[in-house]
Every structure is written in structure tokens, then in C-alpha cells.
Regions:
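Bacterial Sec-dependent N-terminal signal peptides
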Residues: 1-25
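Extracellular or lumenal secretory-pathway regions
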Residues: 19-123, 127-130, 137, 151, ...
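Glycine- and acidic-residue-rich phosphate-binding/metal-coordinating active-site segment common to enzymes
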Residues: 128-133, 137-194
Length: 293
């Protein structure tokens, strides 16, 4: 039966839906490469990499995995393409939405989480270094943000105060940012001029099998936490040495709890397992938090 459910699950994954609100219309989309230096389960140094899209409208910025950006443009849903974002623990960040707040959506087995925090004034210190990044003349600045020192470049040629993740607040688009230890790096690799809606999902509707093996729709709500509480939870669970050997050690076994595991293929043909759209990490790397507090 498990094998049958797995085959059907791949077919219905494409029909996953979200309750979406359009919160603005962005005229540009900035594309960044995010790299994270970490170690695998054997202690070998590795560098994980993924693309991030950033949109902006009327003071709102949305930073989210590029695969999700592509899905929103093309339609449909392929949860397996979200594996890299799940492995790197990169969620969807809404800066100044609601006004004066930062809202983040992130998946961490077995739930989807929504976190909330105040949008603090970011006190950048302008520095003297200059460079040309992605074809844009860039000036430099540094900041201590949530316990991490960031060194960044920005361009006044693109007069929007946005950047990847929660970074922003400079007099121009951030073109490069790295933390003082060189663990995390964001590099601008493209800028797309387009009119696209900025979408905020209130919840997700997924298709799951009932006790008879028939697939039925199910509303999946976000577990709501404060950003500081969720960060503490991630540091405790993902920072445990057991995580890289058994990535779901802190939660009930998927089959024992849900009675099924979905298996689908990403665009590269790799097989990825998930439960109700939440990716199961099969090749975890050591957790490297982007912020310490």
C-alpha cells in the first residue's frame, strides 16, 4: 500500500493549493546566490548553495527561494524542488508586512511555521570600500544584526532599500553581503524588470490519504511562534549532534505518525520524501544559523 500511495502522491502534489493574498505588485525581482559553508555528517567541509528571489512594493520586501518564485510564475507545485531550501533552512521572509513587522514562513518537520518579530531600525555604518558587483558600481557598509556582523555592498543605481533575507535598509539595492566569519554569503546575480504580484499565503491546502487510502484535501495551518522562540527551538533541535545522523530524531517517525510518506522527483530527477508538503531531509548538514538572537 505504501508504494501505491507514493505513486499517487506524486500525481497530486501538483494540485497543492494555498490561500493567497496579493499584498503588492513588484516591478523588479532581484536574484541572489546564497552560499553557506558547513560540514556534512562525517565532518567534511561542504558549501551548500541555492538561489533566492527578492521582490519589493511600497516598503514591503519578500525574500524567498527561487524555486518558489518559479512555481508562482509557472503555476503548479513540485515540493521536491524545495529540498535545497529545506536543507539550508531558508524560509520566506516578508519585511514590513504587516507594517513594522517581519513575518517568516519556514518548514521544519513535521510542521510549517509562521514567525513574527518587530522590524528594527537597521543601523548600518558606511565604509570606504568600493567594488563592481553584477555590473553595478557598489559602495560598502557594515552592521551588527541579531548577534552577527555583516559586511555588505550596495548600489545607488538601483534605488530600493532591499536585500536578501532580512538584510536591507541601505540607500540602494544590496549587491553582496557576507558575515564576518565568512559562513554565509549572498551575491546578486541578476535583476529582472517585471510586474509580478507579491503573494502572502495564509495557509496551505494539501492532499493526504485517509484510512482507506483515498486522497482528500486537508487544510494545513502554520504553527505560529515568535521569531526568538523559533530560533531557540531550531538552535536546540538542529544544533544537536544527533541531527546530522538522524534528522527527524526530535519528532515522531513519519510513517508511525502519518501512516504515509510521499515520494516525488525534483527537476534534477532526485527522489525527495515529504509529509503533507513538508520535506524530509535525507542528507542533513550541520546547522549554521543566520542570526544568533
Amino acid at each position: 500500500m505504501k508504494k501505491i500511495l507514493t505513486i499517487i502522491a506524486f500525481a497530486v502534489n501538483m494540485s497543492a493549493m494555498a490561500q493567497k493574498d496579493t499584498i503588492g505588485v513588484s516591478i523588479i525581482t532581484a536574484i541572489y546566490r546564497y552560499e553557506c559553508k558547513t560540514k556534512d555528517a562525517d565532518g567534511k567541509s561542504v558549501t551548500d548553495s541555492m538561489l533566492i528571489a527578492v521582490q519589493t512594493s511600497d516598503g514591503i520586501a519578500k525574500s524567498f527561494p527561487y524555486e518558489e518564485y518559479e512555481r508562482q510564475k509557472m503555476g503548479g507545485s513540485r515540493i521536491a524542488d524545495g529540498y535545497q531550501a529545506a536543507q539550508m533552512h531558508m524560509g520566506t521572509v516578508f519585511v514590513n508586512y504587516p507594517e513594522g513587522r517581519i513575518t517568516t514562513h519556514e518548514m521544519l518537520y513535521p510542521y510549517r511555521y509562521q514567525t513574527d518579530e518587530a522590524l528594527e531600525k537597521r543601523e548600518w555604518k558606511l565604509t570606504e570600500a568600493k567594488d563592481t558587483i553584477c555590473g553595478y558600481a557598489s559602495l560598502s557598509a557594515s552592521i551588527d544584526y541579531h548577534g552577527v556582523t555583516w559586511n555588505a555592498y550596495y548600489t545607488e543605481d538601483v534605488p530600493v532599500s532591499i536585500g536578501p533575507w532580512k538584510l536591507g535598509g541601505l540607500p540602494g539595492l544590496i549587491t553582496y553581503a557576507t558575515d564576518a566569519k565568512g559562513i554565509h554569503t549572498f551575491t546578486l546575480c541578476g535583476l529582472i524588470k517585471e510586474d509580478v504580484p507579491i503573494v502572502f499565503a495564509e495557509y496551505v491546502t494539501w492532499f493526504v490519504p485517509d484510512e482507506k487510502g483515498k486522497f482528500v484535501s486537508q487544510r494545513v495551518d502554520y504553527q505560529k511562534r515568535t521569531a526568538s522562540d523559533f530560533l531557540s527551538y531550531k538552535k536546540k533541535m538542529l544544533g544537536n549532534r544527533r541531527y546530522v545522523k538522524s534528522p527527524t530524531y526530535y519528532a515522531p517517525d513519519p510513517m508511525a505518525t502519518f501512516g504515509y510518506v510521499e515520494t516525488s522527483s525534483n527537476s534534477s530527477g532526485d527522489r525527495v520524501s515529504s509529509v503533507a508538503g513538508v520535506v524530509l531531509i535525507s542528507n542533513p548538514h550541520q546547522y549554521q544559523p543566520l542570526e544568533m538572537k
